[in-house]
Swiss-Prot record:
The lineage of its organism: Eukaryota, Fungi, Dikarya, Ascomycota, Pezizomycotina. It is an enzyme of class 3 (hydrolase). Signal peptide: none annotated. It is found in: Cytoplasm; Nucleus. GO terms for cellular component: cytoplasm; nucleus. It comes from the Eukaryota. The active site is at S124 (charge relay system), D180 (charge relay system), H213 (charge relay system). Its main location: cytoplasm. This is Acyl-protein thioesterase 1. It comes from Emericella nidulans (strain FGSC A4 / ATCC 38163 / CBS 112.46 / NRRL 194 / M139).
Amino acid sequence: MSRAPFIVPALKKHTATVIMAHGLGDSGAGWVSLAHNWRRRGLFEEVTFIFPNAPMIPITVNFGMSMPGWYDITKLGRDLDFQEAVKNQDEAGILKSRDYFNSLIKEQMDQGIKPSRIVLGGFSQGGAMSLFSGITGQEKLGGVFGLSCYMLLSDRIKNYIPENFPNKKTPFFLAHGTEDDIVPHEFGKRSAEMAKELGLEDVTFNSYKYLSHSADPVEIEDLEKFLDRVIPAENGGSL
Protein backbone atom coordinates (compact mmCIF):
# COMPACT_ATOMS: atom_id res chain seq x y z
CA MET A 1 0.00 0.00 0.00
CA SER A 2 1.28 3.47 -0.92
CA ARG A 3 2.00 6.17 1.62
CA ALA A 4 -0.09 9.30 1.27
CA PRO A 5 1.20 11.76 -1.34
CA PHE A 6 3.21 14.84 -0.45
CA ILE A 7 1.06 17.88 -1.20
CA VAL A 8 2.13 21.48 -1.76
CA PRO A 9 -1.13 23.46 -1.66
CA ALA A 10 -1.97 26.44 -3.84
CA LEU A 11 -1.17 29.84 -2.33
CA LYS A 12 -4.06 31.56 -4.08
CA LYS A 13 -7.47 30.23 -5.08
CA HIS A 14 -6.89 26.63 -6.17
CA THR A 15 -7.69 26.45 -9.90
CA ALA A 16 -5.30 23.78 -11.18
CA THR A 17 -3.42 20.66 -10.05
CA VAL A 18 -0.15 19.08 -11.15
CA ILE A 19 0.43 15.43 -10.23
CA MET A 20 4.14 14.56 -10.45
CA ALA A 21 5.18 10.91 -10.06
CA HIS A 22 8.71 9.87 -9.07
CA GLY A 23 10.92 7.17 -10.55
CA LEU A 24 11.97 3.72 -9.37
CA GLY A 25 13.39 3.65 -5.84
CA ASP A 26 12.52 7.27 -5.13
CA SER A 27 9.65 8.92 -3.27
CA GLY A 28 7.40 11.91 -3.71
CA ALA A 29 9.72 13.84 -1.40
CA GLY A 30 12.41 13.64 -4.07
CA TRP A 31 10.55 16.09 -6.28
CA VAL A 32 8.89 18.42 -3.76
CA SER A 33 11.76 20.90 -4.18
CA LEU A 34 10.50 21.51 -7.72
CA ALA A 35 7.28 23.04 -6.37
CA HIS A 36 9.12 24.92 -3.62
CA ASN A 37 11.46 26.46 -6.20
CA TRP A 38 8.50 27.72 -8.21
CA ARG A 39 6.91 29.02 -5.00
CA ARG A 40 10.04 31.04 -4.18
CA ARG A 41 9.86 32.62 -7.62
CA GLY A 42 6.17 33.44 -7.30
CA LEU A 43 5.12 30.97 -10.01
CA PHE A 44 2.08 28.68 -10.22
CA GLU A 45 0.46 30.12 -7.11
CA GLU A 46 -3.00 28.80 -8.15
CA VAL A 47 -1.63 25.26 -8.50
CA THR A 48 -1.70 22.48 -5.93
CA PHE A 49 1.18 20.06 -6.50
CA ILE A 50 0.71 16.40 -5.62
CA PHE A 51 3.73 14.08 -5.34
CA PRO A 52 2.47 10.50 -4.91
CA ASN A 53 4.51 7.71 -3.33
CA ALA A 54 4.84 4.35 -5.06
CA PRO A 55 4.24 1.19 -3.02
CA MET A 56 7.08 -1.07 -1.92
CA ILE A 57 7.12 -3.99 -4.37
CA PRO A 58 9.64 -6.70 -5.37
CA ILE A 59 11.73 -5.44 -8.30
CA THR A 60 13.40 -8.05 -10.51
CA VAL A 61 16.36 -5.84 -11.50
CA ASN A 62 16.92 -5.25 -7.77
CA PHE A 63 17.45 -9.01 -7.26
CA GLY A 64 13.80 -9.35 -6.28
CA MET A 65 14.18 -7.10 -3.26
CA SER A 66 11.41 -4.63 -2.51
CA MET A 67 11.72 -0.93 -3.26
CA PRO A 68 9.32 1.87 -4.23
CA GLY A 69 8.04 1.16 -7.72
CA TRP A 70 4.97 1.71 -9.86
CA TYR A 71 5.52 -1.67 -11.55
CA ASP A 72 8.16 -4.39 -11.73
CA ILE A 73 11.09 -4.04 -14.12
CA THR A 74 12.90 -7.11 -15.41
CA LYS A 75 15.62 -5.44 -17.51
CA LEU A 76 17.27 -2.03 -17.55
CA GLY A 77 20.20 -0.19 -19.12
CA ARG A 78 21.77 1.43 -22.17
CA ASP A 79 22.22 -1.85 -24.07
CA LEU A 80 18.57 -2.86 -23.81
CA ASP A 81 16.75 -3.03 -27.15
CA PHE A 82 13.41 -1.19 -27.34
CA GLN A 83 11.52 -4.20 -28.63
CA GLU A 84 13.10 -6.39 -25.94
CA ALA A 85 12.01 -3.91 -23.28
CA VAL A 86 8.38 -4.31 -24.34
CA LYS A 87 8.47 -8.03 -23.61
CA ASN A 88 7.52 -9.31 -20.16
CA GLN A 89 6.37 -5.92 -18.89
CA ASP A 90 4.42 -5.99 -15.64
CA GLU A 91 0.99 -5.39 -17.15
CA ALA A 92 -0.89 -6.07 -13.91
CA GLY A 93 1.33 -3.65 -11.98
CA ILE A 94 1.02 -0.99 -14.67
CA LEU A 95 -2.77 -1.21 -14.69
CA LYS A 96 -2.91 -1.13 -10.89
CA SER A 97 -0.82 2.05 -10.81
CA ARG A 98 -2.92 3.57 -13.59
CA ASP A 99 -6.00 3.00 -11.45
CA TYR A 100 -4.27 4.77 -8.57
CA PHE A 101 -3.33 7.74 -10.76
CA ASN A 102 -6.93 7.89 -11.99
CA SER A 103 -8.12 7.96 -8.37
CA LEU A 104 -5.88 10.98 -7.70
CA ILE A 105 -7.41 12.73 -10.71
CA LYS A 106 -10.91 11.89 -9.50
CA GLU A 107 -10.13 13.27 -6.03
CA GLN A 108 -9.19 16.58 -7.61
CA MET A 109 -12.33 16.59 -9.73
CA ASP A 110 -14.39 15.91 -6.60
CA GLN A 111 -12.81 19.04 -5.13
CA GLY A 112 -14.08 21.07 -8.07
CA ILE A 113 -10.99 21.09 -10.29
CA LYS A 114 -11.88 20.57 -13.94
CA PRO A 115 -9.90 17.76 -15.63
CA SER A 116 -8.77 20.33 -18.22
CA ARG A 117 -6.95 22.05 -15.32
CA ILE A 118 -5.17 18.88 -14.20
CA VAL A 119 -1.70 17.95 -15.48
CA LEU A 120 -0.26 14.47 -15.00
CA GLY A 121 3.47 13.88 -15.28
CA GLY A 122 6.54 12.25 -13.88
CA PHE A 123 10.15 11.16 -14.15
CA SER A 124 11.38 7.77 -15.43
CA GLN A 125 8.90 5.14 -14.16
CA GLY A 126 6.59 7.94 -13.05
CA GLY A 127 6.81 9.53 -16.48
CA ALA A 128 6.12 6.21 -18.19
CA MET A 129 3.06 5.73 -15.99
CA SER A 130 1.87 9.27 -16.73
CA LEU A 131 2.27 8.76 -20.47
CA PHE A 132 0.35 5.47 -20.33
CA SER A 133 -2.33 6.84 -18.00
CA GLY A 134 -2.80 9.95 -20.12
CA ILE A 135 -3.13 8.07 -23.39
CA THR A 136 -5.55 5.52 -21.95
CA GLY A 137 -7.42 7.88 -19.61
CA GLN A 138 -11.16 8.53 -19.55
CA GLU A 139 -10.82 12.25 -18.71
CA LYS A 140 -9.48 14.96 -21.01
CA LEU A 141 -6.58 16.43 -19.07
CA GLY A 142 -4.92 19.81 -19.38
CA GLY A 143 -1.60 18.20 -20.22
CA VAL A 144 0.73 15.24 -19.72
CA PHE A 145 4.51 15.25 -19.34
CA GLY A 146 7.21 12.62 -19.04
CA LEU A 147 10.89 13.16 -18.29
CA SER A 148 13.38 10.40 -19.18
CA CYS A 149 10.60 7.90 -19.82
CA TYR A 150 9.18 5.53 -22.41
CA MET A 151 5.95 4.04 -23.74
CA LEU A 152 4.57 1.16 -21.67
CA LEU A 153 2.83 -1.84 -23.25
CA SER A 154 3.48 -0.30 -26.66
CA ASP A 155 2.55 -3.53 -28.42
CA ARG A 156 -0.98 -3.48 -26.95
CA ILE A 157 -1.66 0.01 -25.65
CA LYS A 158 -4.27 0.49 -28.40
CA ASN A 159 -6.43 -2.04 -26.57
CA TYR A 160 -6.64 0.32 -23.58
CA ILE A 161 -7.46 3.56 -25.40
CA PRO A 162 -11.13 4.56 -24.94
CA GLU A 163 -13.14 4.64 -28.16
CA ASN A 164 -13.64 8.41 -27.91
CA PHE A 165 -9.90 8.96 -27.17
CA PRO A 166 -10.37 11.87 -24.70
CA ASN A 167 -6.71 12.94 -24.76
CA LYS A 168 -6.21 12.84 -28.52
CA LYS A 169 -5.76 16.64 -28.61
CA THR A 170 -4.21 17.01 -25.13
CA PRO A 171 -0.67 18.49 -25.15
CA PHE A 172 2.05 15.95 -24.28
CA PHE A 173 5.59 17.06 -23.36
CA LEU A 174 8.37 14.45 -23.42
CA ALA A 175 11.98 15.25 -22.55
CA HIS A 176 15.11 13.09 -22.53
CA GLY A 177 18.87 13.39 -22.03
CA THR A 178 21.08 12.15 -24.86
CA GLU A 179 23.44 10.41 -22.41
CA ASP A 180 20.80 8.56 -20.39
CA ASP A 181 22.33 5.21 -19.40
CA ILE A 182 19.23 3.89 -17.62
CA VAL A 183 16.44 4.64 -20.09
CA PRO A 184 18.18 5.16 -23.45
CA HIS A 185 17.44 8.37 -25.34
CA GLU A 186 16.22 6.26 -28.25
CA PHE A 187 13.42 4.91 -26.02
CA GLY A 188 12.12 8.43 -25.47
CA LYS A 189 12.38 9.33 -29.14
CA ARG A 190 10.63 6.14 -30.26
CA SER A 191 7.93 6.65 -27.64
CA ALA A 192 7.20 10.17 -28.92
CA GLU A 193 6.93 8.80 -32.45
CA MET A 194 4.59 6.05 -31.26
CA ALA A 195 2.43 8.59 -29.44
CA LYS A 196 1.94 10.43 -32.71
CA GLU A 197 1.25 7.17 -34.54
CA LEU A 198 -1.47 6.40 -31.99
CA GLY A 199 -3.17 9.63 -33.03
CA LEU A 200 -2.00 12.16 -30.44
CA GLU A 201 -2.05 15.55 -32.14
CA ASP A 202 0.09 17.68 -29.80
CA VAL A 203 3.33 15.89 -28.88
CA THR A 204 6.57 17.72 -28.11
CA PHE A 205 9.84 15.80 -27.71
CA ASN A 206 12.91 17.67 -26.46
CA SER A 207 16.43 16.28 -26.31
CA TYR A 208 19.09 17.60 -23.93
CA LYS A 209 22.74 17.15 -24.90
CA TYR A 210 25.04 15.49 -22.36
CA LEU A 211 22.22 14.97 -19.86
CA SER A 212 22.18 11.56 -18.15
CA HIS A 213 19.24 9.95 -16.31
CA SER A 214 18.28 13.09 -14.45
CA ALA A 215 16.75 16.52 -14.95
CA ASP A 216 18.59 19.78 -15.54
CA PRO A 217 17.69 23.50 -15.31
CA VAL A 218 17.07 23.94 -19.04
CA GLU A 219 14.72 20.95 -19.08
CA ILE A 220 12.85 22.24 -16.01
CA GLU A 221 12.57 25.66 -17.64
CA ASP A 222 10.98 24.00 -20.68
CA LEU A 223 8.60 22.12 -18.39
CA GLU A 224 7.76 25.43 -16.71
CA LYS A 225 6.84 26.92 -20.10
CA PHE A 226 4.72 23.87 -20.89
CA LEU A 227 2.76 24.18 -17.64
CA ASP A 228 2.27 27.89 -18.22
CA ARG A 229 0.79 27.06 -21.63
CA VAL A 230 -1.57 24.26 -20.63
CA ILE A 231 -2.84 25.62 -17.29
CA PRO A 232 -2.56 29.42 -17.58
CA ALA A 233 -3.49 31.55 -14.60
CA GLU A 234 -7.22 32.20 -14.24
CA ASN A 235 -7.12 34.88 -11.53
CA GLY A 236 -4.64 37.23 -13.16
CA GLY A 237 -0.89 37.35 -12.75
CA SER A 238 1.32 34.29 -12.69
CA LEU A 239 -0.14 30.88 -12.10
